[in-house]
């Protein structure tokens, strides 16, 4: 965020709150519920309304699967950081797919390949550069 001249405070707060609705088990619309929760919380703390708007935009648009465009550099930073998190926990993804989901080898490979491909494709170029080696390595393992 800093390297891209984004408002670091907005990105940090959005990153802390972007998945907050998952606590209540809301996965499908957690971006919508999370943005509403963030607005209520930050308003109750007397936070600046312009920054609240930016934070809500970040949270609403952080999921690539929703089709909600990331209009600000802060939103792009959050979406990229969210996608990058998968590359910090590669073994966890394998465990989840094979142990928790019980996938067979080929089905699991396809799920993992798809997840990492989607994550990589939604990143801004600066983020891609940071995880490129891991992305290439995961794809080689899955060949």
Give, region by region, the residue ranges found by the protein language model:
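An amphipathic alpha-helix signature
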Residues: 32-39, 56, 109, 113
